[in-house]
Amino acid sequence: MDASVTTCRAWTWHAPGEPEQLRLEDQGIVSPGPGEIVVRNTMIALNPVDWKVIAASPDGWRPGHVPGVDGVGIVAQAGDGVGIPLGTRVAYHQGLGKAGSFAEYTTVDADCALVIPDGVSDESAAGIPCPGLTAWQALAKVPDMPNRDVLVTGAGGAVSLILAQLALRRNWRVWATASPVHRERLLALGIAGTFDYRDEGWRAQLVAALGSRRLFAAFDTTNGAYARGLAPLVGYNGHLVCIQDRLESPPLPPFTTALSLHEVALNSAHGHATAEDWREWRQAGAHLLDAVRVGALDLQPHIVTAFDDLPPSLSALKHGRIKGQKILVRIEV
């Protein structure tokens, strides 16, 4: 990195609101401390969490904060104790409390950086950190027991599409809710059956398909209320995994199916993970990226927009004007 480069362009947050309220400003590049790297971003991946926190005014955000959790780029600087060489391509998932990926340069903890193998494009790598690691964490909540049935909701989405494929690797029968437009693709991947989430009778259809069996686990990506409605479908000693929201109270009476409840909060790693947790994080990320490299993991189709168009692109994601596609933002520095 040229020592004369000390500032960069960044989209900044100033008050709770819509993505269009972000401002494009010049910001100083934060020099890396011990264990940190500066990434020259080449690609930003937009995620629902981005527009949610922009609207919510998170604790610690001040006017001028740079949002964005997922990015891909080149290591331009490294602090003491970092083993990643300069020039290495990495993907990362930034903590919400730190200056994020909506910038030409981002300073991140090396712990959260995933080295991208040759043969994986920036576009594909950008689809891994938030969706892929969330799917991995969700699956890790549930014991790997053979010959089980599980449900994944919203399987047309980035997280659920990856999660469904990881669940299939456990030799589970995987059922999914999704829009009919995704049905053929999901069945081709090996999904046992899909149900239109807009059909009020889909739960009865699932019960009929299961016959005498019950679900071992249900993975929900919708919201807490929706997850609560899935609880009666899960059998004895089963698992309900909430990827979006969490359940504050048990959804079923005590001493019935002994349902286990699980919360998934990927970004909480930045405040609570140990060194061993981060090692597992990077190992999981490496496995996901390698699966992409060898063609063993399908990702959402993507569209690529320009850095100057980031706010309207994020707004399109928020308001459902673009569905079933990952929105990526390319940065030309």
Predicted regions and their residues:
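C-terminal capping/lid region of NAD(P)-dependent oxidoreductase domains
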Residues: 2-4, 293-303, 311-333
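N-terminal glycine-rich beta->alpha transition that marks the start or flank
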Residues: 3-6, 18-21, 26-72, 84
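Mid-domain Rossmann-like dinucleotide-binding core that forms the NAD(H)/NADP(H) cofactor-binding site
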Residues: 128-199
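C-terminal substrate-binding/catalytic core of Rossmann-like NAD(P)-dependent dehydrogenases/reductases
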Residues: 255-303
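A glycine-/small-residue-rich N-terminal strand-loop-strand element
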Residues: 54, 72-95
